[in-house]
Amino acid sequence: MATATAISDASNAVVVPVVPAPELVQATIPGSDITVGHALTSEAAIIAKIGADTFTATFGFSVSAEDLDMFLAETYSETNVLADMQDPAVQTWAARDTSGKVLGLVQLVRGLSEPCVPGDPTTHAELRRLYVETTAHGRGIGSKLIAAVEEQARAEGFKQLWLTVWEHNPKAERLYLRLGYRKYGDVDFITGTCVQTDHVLSKAL
């Protein structure tokens, strides 16, 4: 299933302290040809491409070409993706097939929350940028990536896992709702000069 999330406007986010994370959980799905584990810096280029291609396919029609180009250059350049991967507050996960090819990605982000998310902000973590290569849709990869992030967040003691999803992406929102997430509010999402609305969803872990 094609799913995508986008980061919320940083001006709305609540910054909370980041604590050191325990050893990463690795997820191998029994009976599946997909393995989910933390991404390698050597995979930054393919992760940047999957992110840019999926974002363009999902959201590109809704903004001008200039705004899209600006956003992609700021967010999905290989340099910026690599910087994210080296940020101790961010853990990037990759889904790989048996050949080792990266087919999807997702991020666990520590130290940010939204005011509408219930509970203590210091116990919140964010699920960010769930993207699956278009040729790999329909294989349950999105759900497997979400499950891996949820498992890691629980292992680190987080109590709420929140995310944002574009208001005009009902397919992605249905997936999250089916997996137990609930809508708690809305935030602005800025692409270049275009301001759009994302729904804030969260799940108790």
What are these regions (language model features)?
Residues H137-I141:
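Glycine-rich ATP-binding loop(s) of histidine-kinase-like ATPases
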Residues S113, W162-V165, L177, R182-H199:
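Conserved catalytic-core motifs of GNAT/GCN5-like acyltransferases
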Residues V132, W166-E167:
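Short amphipathic helical patch at the helix-1/turn junction of helix-turn-helix
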Residues A172:
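Helix-turn-helix
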Residues T3-D9, A13-E23, I29, H38-A44, ...:
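Acetyl-CoA-dependent GNAT
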